[in-house]
C-alpha cells in the first residue's frame, strides 16, 4: 500500500502504452476526472537513451483518492491504443527519471554491446573469435546463464573504446556457427539493471506490471527470497570476464559484491517485486491464459499477430520493446481461455513473414484474472489442469514441489510426453498437444547437445 505524502512516497501512478506522439495535454484529458498535481508539470514522461519517447510516464496526483480514480482508467484507450495504469511512488519515479533519458549519467559511452541469439553452449573464446580484430577489455565478456547453468543465448561485451564498439555493431546479423547474431548498443548501466534496483524499493514494492526475463531489458528486478534473482535472471560467471572475477554471484545465492563494487545482499531478500518500465520487460495477465512469442520480425505489428493466430481471437497483444525503445522480437498474447491458449500452440514454429516464431505456453486451466500473476519462464511449461486461479503464480521454479513443470532437455523432459497428473489430475484435453511438446523438447535438446 502506498504511503501518504508525509511518508515521502507521494501519490503517483505510472502509465504505459502511450502513443509515441502523446503530449501532456492529452494525458491531462485522459485523466480529466483526476486532479493532477501542478497540472502539466505533474506529468513526467520517460525517454530512452536516444531521447525518444518510451510510451510511458509518471503522473503525480493530489491525494490517495485521486490515485484510486486514476487506477480506474487502466486499460482505457487513448487514440487507437489502450493505456495501462499502475500504482507507483516518488522513489520509483525519481530513480527511473534519473537513470533514463539522453542526459542520464548511465548513458556514458563505455563501449558495451549486447549480443542475442548465441548458440547454446557458446563460449567466451568463440565470442572473441567472432570479434577478431576488435579489442575487448580484460574480463569484458559477461555470459548470463539460467538457474541450471545453461546459456541464455545472450551476452554483454565491453570493448576498449566506444569507437570499437561502433565497429562491433556492424557485425549485426553475422553468424556464429549456424546462428545469426543480433548486436545492440548497451552500457554498463544496462548490465547493472539486471540486479541493481533502489534498495528502498526492494523492500516495499508490491507486484507490478513489468516482468519478462531477458538480458538488458530495462530496470527490472525481482525479490523472492535468497537466490531467486539468480535463478530467474541468470548467474553471471565463466572464465573470460564472468562476475566471479569480481567476487560477484560466487556463493550460490548471489551474495557478495558485484563487478561494480556494490553489496548485492539486498537483491535477494524479501518478497517484493518491482520493475522500471523498459517498455515491455514485464507482462501481467488478466486472464491467466497467455502465449509468449519469440523470433518475431522486427516490423511485426499487433495486427500481424492477431492474423497469425486466426481464427483464434486473442484478448490482447503486447509487443515488447527494450530500454532503447526498439522492439525485442518478442511478445505476449493473452487469450480468454486455457483451451484457446493451448490451441494457439499449434502455431509453434510457424512462419511470420520470413521468420519462424517460437511459442511458449503460460496458461493454467481454471485460472482467472485478479491476483493471478503471469510470468514467462522459457524453460518450463506452466500449464496445470484443474488448478484454481486467484493468487496462483505460474512461475514456480523447478525443485519447488510442482511436479508438472518439466525442464526442456533436463532429466524431467520425459514428463513432457505424458499427461500432467500428480495432484492436479489428468489432462486428457491436452492429448493432441503432447506430440508438439515432445518435438519441442527434442529440438531443444539437440540445440544444447
UniProtKB/Swiss-Prot annotation:
Residues 11-90, 111-188, 289-364 form the RRM domain. Pfam families: RRM_1, zf-RNPHF. The keyword Ribonucleoprotein applies. Residues 354-392 are annotated as: 2 X 19 AA perfect repeats. Keywords: Acetylation, Isopeptide bond, Methylation, mRNA processing, mRNA splicing, Nucleus, Phosphoprotein, Repeat, Ribonucleoprotein, RNA-binding, Spliceosome, Ubl conjugation. One of its GO terms (cellular component) is ribonucleoprotein complex. SMART domains: RRM. GO terms for biological process: cellular response to interleukin-7; cellular response to peptide; mRNA processing; regulation of RNA splicing; RNA processing; RNA splicing. GO terms for molecular function: enzyme binding; identical protein binding; RNA binding. The modification Omega-N-methylarginine is found at residue 233. Transmembrane segments: none annotated. This protein is a component of the heterogeneous nuclear ribonucleoprotein (hnRNP) complexes which provide the substrate for the processing events that pre-mRNAs undergo before becoming functional, translatable mRNAs in the cytoplasm. Mediates pre-mRNA alternative splicing regulation. Inhibits, together with CUGBP1, insulin receptor (IR) pre-mRNA exon 11 inclusion in myoblast. Binds to the IR RNA. Binds poly(RG). This is Heterogeneous nuclear ribonucleoprotein H.
Amino acid at each position: 500500500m502506498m504511503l501518504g505524502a508525509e511518508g515521502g512516497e507521494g501519490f503517483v501512478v505510472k502509465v504505459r502504452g502511450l502513443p509515441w506522439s502523446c503530449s501532456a495535454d492529452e494525458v491531462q484529458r485522459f485523466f480529466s476526472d483526476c486532479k493532477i498535481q501542478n497540472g502539466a508539470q505533474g506529468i513526467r514522461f520517460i525517454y530512452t537513451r536516444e531521447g525518444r519517447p518510451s510510451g510511458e510516464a509518471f503522473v503525480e496526483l493530489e491525494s490517495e483518492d485521486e490515485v484510486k480514480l486514476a487506477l480506474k482508467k487502466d486499460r482505457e484507450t487513448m487514440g487507437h491504443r489502450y493505456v495501462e495504469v499502475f500504482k507507483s511512488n516518488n522513489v520509483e519515479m525519481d530513480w527511473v527519471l534519473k537513470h533514463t533519458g539522453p542526459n542520464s549519467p548511465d548513458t556514458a559511452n563505455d563501449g558495451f554491446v549486447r549480443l542475442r541469439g548465441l548458440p547454446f553452449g557458446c563460449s567466451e573464446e568463440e565470442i572473441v573469435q567472432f570479434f577478431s580484430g576488435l579489442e575487448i577489455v580484460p574480463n569484458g565478456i559477461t555470459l548470463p546463464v539460467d538457474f541450471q547453468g545453461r546459456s541464455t543465448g545472450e551476452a554483454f561485451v565491453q570493448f576498449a573504446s566506444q569507437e570499437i564498439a561502433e565497429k562491433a555493431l556492424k557485425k549485426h546479423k553475422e553468424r556464429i556457427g549456424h546462428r545469426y547474431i543480433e548486436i545492440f548498443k548497451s552500457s554498463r548501466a544496462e548490465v547493472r539493471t539486471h540486479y541493481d534496483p533502489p534498495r528502498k524499493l526492494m523492500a516495499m514494492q508490491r507486484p507490478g506490471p513489468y516482468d519478462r526475463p531477458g538480458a538488458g531489458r530495462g530496470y527490472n528486478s525481482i525479490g523472492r527470497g535468497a537466490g531467486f534473482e539468480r535463478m530467474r535472471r541468470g548467474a553471471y560467471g565463466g572464465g573470460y570476464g564472468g562476475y566471479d572475477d569480481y567476487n560477484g554471484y560466487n556463493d550460490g545465492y548471489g551474495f557478495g559484491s558485484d563487478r561494480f563494487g556494490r553489496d548485492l545482499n539486498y537483491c535477494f531478500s524479501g518478497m517484493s517485486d518491482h520493475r522500471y518500465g523498459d517498455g515491455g520487460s514485464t507482462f501481467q495477465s488478466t486472464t491467466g491464459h497467455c502465449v509468449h512469442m519469440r523470433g518475431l520480425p522486427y516490423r511485426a505489428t499487433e495486427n500481424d499477430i492477431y492474423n497469425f493466430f486466426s481464427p483464434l481471437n486473442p484478448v490482447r497483444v503486447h509487443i515488447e520493446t527494450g530500454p532503447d525503445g526498439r522492439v525485442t522480437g518478442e511478445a505476449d498474447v493473452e487469450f480468454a481461455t486455457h483451451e484457446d491458449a493451448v490451441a494457439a500452440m499449434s502455431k509453434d514454429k510457424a512462419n511470420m513473414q520470413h521468420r519462424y516464431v517460437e511459442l511458449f505456453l503460460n496458461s493454467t486451466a481454471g485460472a482467472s484474472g485478479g491476483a493471478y500473476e503471469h510470468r514467462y519462464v522459457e524453460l518450463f511449461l506452466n500449464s496445470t489442469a484443474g488448478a484454481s486461479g486467484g493468487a496462483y503464480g505460474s512461475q514456480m521454479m523447478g525443485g519447488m514441489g510442482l511436479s508438472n513443470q518439466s525442464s526442456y532437455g533436463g532429466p524431467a523432459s520425459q514428463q513432457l510426453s505424458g499427461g500432467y497428473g500428480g495432484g492436479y489430475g489428468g489432462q486428457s484435453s491436452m492429448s493432441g498437444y503432447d506430440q508438439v511438446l515432445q518435438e519441442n523438447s527434442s529440438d531443444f535438446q539437440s540445440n544444447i547437445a
